[in-house]
Amino acid sequence: MILTVTPNPAVDHTIHFDEPLQTGVVHRTDDAVFTAGGKGINVAKYASALDADVTASGFLGGHFGKFVRDRLDADGIASDFVTVDADTRLNTTVLAADGEYKLNHNGPQIRAADVDELVETAQANEPDTLLVGGSLPPGMSLSDVDRLARAGDWKIAVDMGGEYLAELDADYYVCKPNRSELAAATGRTVETEADAVEAAEELHARGFEYVLASLGADGALLVTDDEVLSAPALDVEVVDTVGAGDAVMSGFLAAREHGLSDADALRMGVLTASRVVGVAGTRVPDLEDVLTNETHVEVTTVRTR
């Protein structure tokens, strides 16, 4: 079983405008989507669609927290959240003719007692894999993440920002940086695939068993103990990139839970992301739809190690 922990979940509000945004102008639209969001929650939604046994956890509070719970219940996704006093945040993505704008809140204040309850929740669920995804809310630190990682006999997956990956010092199962997070975590310039390979191998050397790097239109890389694998992105129309990296992690974890190989797990990550970017918001892809393009993703070995 996979337990996803989202310390700082959100209601994702995605708005679409056909015209460029202008200062001082009131822009109106009927094209708006509200979804339950946050990296761990997204992974839970996508992995569940891929027939993985998954439960979503983390901190929720207030009206927006209730929205997240209700939406997960409606989608048939198991959840076991810790209730906190402050409100869950609202994150807004604006898709306009002149680009994509992201407006994120910091999140609620978390108390030490909340972290204690989260650790107890994880222990009660006894997962095989525990994923920590997204930013940390005020009051929670990386030492709390490490405590969560060591609180049970489970594999730890992390999908966090580069500033967090730079500080983590533990033998974790897998991390999933994107290009900018690879750069932030290693202090390297990451522009080419070769740059990404070097940065990902550095993270692997720090103790991650797998480094799964999502590179947007350039696909994804997987660094293992034995080799570096590469999978190209599918040529699809991109509507919204929100949740794309989460989809890569979801496909990987779901495939590993089903006993698939490293190459097939990387392929599943790329396939899942290819479906997610085709719709606005973090809507859940259908497994049958994901597998439609299975033969179109050729995984290659970049190098052996």
Curated annotation (Swiss-Prot):
Catalyses which reaction(s): beta-D-fructose 1-phosphate + ATP = beta-D-fructose 1,6-bisphosphate + ADP + H(+)
Keyword Nucleotide-binding attached: yes
Active site (UniProt): D246
Protein origin, superkingdom: Archaea
Disruption phenotype: Loss of growth on fructose. Growth on glucose is not affected.
Description of what induces expression: Expression is highly up-regulated in presence of fructose.
Keyword field contains Nucleotide-binding: yes
Binding, ATP: S214, L215, G216, A217, D218, G219, G245, D246
GO MF assignments: 1-phosphofructokinase activity; ATP binding
EC number(s) from the headed UniProt entry: 2.7.1.56
pH dependence per the UniProt record: Optimum pH is between 7.5 and 9.
Protein's job: Catalyzes the ATP-dependent phosphorylation of fructose-l-phosphate to fructose-l,6-bisphosphate. Involved in the utilization of fructose as a sole carbon and energy source.
Subunit note: Homodimer.
UniProt protein name: 1-phosphofructokinase
Organism expressing this protein natively: Haloferax volcanii (strain ATCC 29605 / DSM 3757 / JCM 8879 / NBRC 14742 / NCIMB 2012 / VKM B-1768 / DS2) (Halobacterium volcanii)
Source species taxonomy: Archaea, Methanobacteriati, Methanobacteriota, Stenosarchaea group, Halobacteria
